[in-house]
Amino acid sequence: MKIFATSDVHGNRRIMDKLNTVAADVDLILVCGDIGGKDGRGKTFRQFSEYQKRDADYLSSVLKDIETESRFILGNDDWFEYEDSHYLQKVETIGGLKFIPFEYVLLTPFNTNREVNDNKLEYELGKFSAGSNTVMVAHTPPLGAGDILYNGSHCGSRYVRAWIEDVQPKLWLCGHIHEDNSATWIGDTLVLNCACNYPDGVLRGWIVDTDTMEYEAVEI
């Protein structure tokens, strides 16, 4: 199976429209959170939430028109509830692989949504039965993989990394840290930070073949 994974579109509809350009080359499209835009923070929370929900509606319509199998999760900058066939809310098996959504992120200085401490991350990950047939569709990166900030410091979760080292899923797909769109191996697990350059309207991500585990960067 060929997967295209991206993340952090942040309401940029130019980026969403570009998903059409990769759809024909893959079997599955995954968007790893932060769907809604960041504009409009001065509005009431309800208005802002509805604004973001319209971004999710637009993404869903794009995915529906593409017709390639697709799923997305929400991230820490998404402040809305959502119901949609493309929204991966529970474990699903697609093409013989188990896809597990994981929307939590490690605590940040910005008091965003879905933030938890390392102990909570460890607890939530402990609920899953995972292994070499598992693809984690996550938002947060593990420590030392796709987690480098603009100042060079690492901000990933040590418990997420420990879980990956122990369980060894096939893939950990994430975003969250826009500065570190990268690929890293942790043992037999390939960690791909798929975050877009949303301010400039640049679609970024990775195409990965789950049979051969070959992967290539995409930037459009």
What residues fall within each predicted segment?
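Active-site-proximal beta-strand elements of phosphoester/diester hydrolases
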Residues: M1-H10, G96-T108, V135-H139, L190-C196, ...
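Active-site environment of divalent metal-dependent phosphoester hydrolases
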Residues: H10-I15, G36-R41, I73-Y82, E92, ...
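Core catalytic region of metal-dependent phosphoesterases/phosphodiesterases
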Residues: G11-I94
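Conserved acidic residues
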Residues: D27-I29, S132-T134, K170
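Redox-cofactor binding/interface segments in oxidoreductases and associated redox assembly factors
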Residues: L30-V31, I100, A138, C174
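Active-site-proximal segments of metal-dependent phosphoesterases and phosphodiesterases across multiple
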Residues: G36-A56, T134-Q168
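Conserved beta-sheet core of the metallophosphoesterase superfamily
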Residues: R71-I73, K98, I148-D211
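Binuclear metal-dependent hydrolase catalytic cores centered on His/Asp/Glu-rich metal-binding motifs
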Residues: G95-V135, S153-A162, E216
